[in-house]
């Protein structure tokens, strides 16, 4: 039985190495980036996961969950992309808050009808904090006021200016409340694996929007072409499944 389990782990490990090459070293996570334009790719033929929005159902970070998310990557489809060029972050955006989405990119927090960048309100995105520089929402700890956030959604790109980075109590839900008269974005993640009662929050306000076509400024195109920040998820999966 032990030998059989060891063989299974070798197989899984080899499989993860293969998909990691695809997800880590390519600059195309759901998008084709060219010199002049950025277009959504419909190549993902998965059926997707049912969107969930219950924060209480989200489990703490673990290498086992990272491994499961890596396996289920084929089942999810991004519906947008977020970049923060000042800290080298570029991630796909998924609809709904669940453990798979949180390990693969940024997850939309709310089911509200206007909870997307096309509408007024508080557009809330969450992701895991992984202790691997540059992975998922780890780069948020280095953002500064005045820096830019870009969100590609449908046929537009929305530009936000960062107002600040804040450390809050997990019980402080004021940052997650709706702001129907405003056009703001809220990004949040854990502070670390060892401080479950605290969260990092980045708040920004919308300053501009662009058509997603050949007129999109090159520096914005470049921001979405940053290497994937999913390394931590796959490295954690390797660690969990690596044959001993």
What residue spans do the PLM features occupy?
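Solvent-exposed, non-transmembrane regions of membrane-associated and secreted proteins
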Residues: 2-244
